[in-house]
């Protein structure tokens, strides 16, 4: 994980590469990763991981020192290694060669060089990551929080928030913040889009639904386990059972003494949530003003 200052003062900024140019490179590379992953059949979490890896690499390395498409392909190859499907190297190399040769297949000798080059860059990425490939994603948490906090709008807000989570990988949000911060940020933006109350609103009604998860002095690990094991289908289908929350006894005093944001996650900080929301929203603002950039990305 990086902090915001490390992102702002990354090596590209130190070399006076303008922020808008850095964004152009990042958005184009992430779009290439997205398009290629769809063609070769990668799941959305593997696609997101590839974007996360490529963003990580160019926080530490100059854009001008590397072939960005090769880094994108190597990121896809590394992320696809966790899939149960067959090795994706050949499919990734084919997509690279089609772009490199303007729609034509590469000769066998050239194709072999492409394979070797992408494999070499994959090893470079692993070294940069210190052989640790992150596996935290916001998607499951979006499902859990949607069910708990929006039982009446569950499917609608989950669908929008998942789309926003996919788009969040065009930003550095997932390189800076834990998955619960990103998940809750996506829910805030989704609720704004759907024009329904957000968890930032003072009068947000469903915050007490989190009582279903909490117990006194719960640890972060226990909280995540409780989120994972709760029977959400039961809660969504039988909303009348939520009335039980109102009947809980004095033992709930512990929960009531927590701050609003501690009720959402034991160590959630409001500043992190707000900063993450703004970072993701900046991407959408850039897409609205994409004529300022020399590339095309559909929302």
Predicted regions and their residues:
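Non-catalytic, interaction-prone regions of core transcription and DNA-replication machinery
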Residues: 1-299
């Amino acid at each position: 994980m990086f902090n915001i200052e490390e992102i702002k003062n990354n090596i590209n900024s130190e070399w006076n590469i303008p922020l808008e140019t850095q964004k152009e490179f990042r958005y184009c590379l992430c779009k290439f990763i997205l398009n290629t992953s769809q063609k070769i059949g990668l799941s959305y979490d593997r696609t997101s991981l590839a974007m996360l890896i490529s963003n990580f690499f160019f926080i530490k390395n100059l854009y001008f020192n590397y072939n960005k498409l090769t880094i994108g392909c190597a990121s896809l190859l590394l992320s696809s290694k966790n899939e149960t499907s067959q090795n994706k190297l050949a499919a990734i190399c084919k997509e690279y060669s089609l772009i490199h040769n303007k729609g034509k297949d590469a000769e066998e000798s050239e194709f072999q060089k492409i394979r070797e080059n992408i494999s070499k860059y994959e090893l470079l990425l692993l070294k940069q990551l210190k052989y640790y490939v992150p596996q935290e994603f916001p998607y499951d948490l979006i499902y859990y929080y949607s069910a708990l906090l929006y039982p009446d709008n569950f499917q609608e807000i989950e669908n929008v928030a998942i789309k926003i989570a996919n788009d969040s990988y065009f930003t550095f949000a997932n390189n800076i913040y834990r998955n619960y911060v990103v998940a809750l940020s996506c829910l805030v933006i989704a609720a704004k889009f759907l024009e329904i109350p957000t968890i930032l609103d003072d009068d947000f009604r469903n915050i007490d639904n989190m009582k279903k998860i909490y117990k006194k002095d719960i640890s972060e690990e226990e909280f995540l386990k409780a989120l994972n094991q709760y029977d959400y289908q039961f809660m969504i289908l039988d909303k009348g059972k939520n009335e039980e929350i109102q009947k809980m006894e004095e033992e709930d005093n512990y929960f009531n003494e927590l701050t609003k944001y501690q009720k959402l996650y034991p160590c959630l900080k409001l500043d992190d949530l707000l900063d993450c929301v703004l970072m993701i929203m900046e991407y959408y603002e850039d897409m609205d003003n994409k004529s300022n950039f020399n590339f095309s990305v559909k929302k």
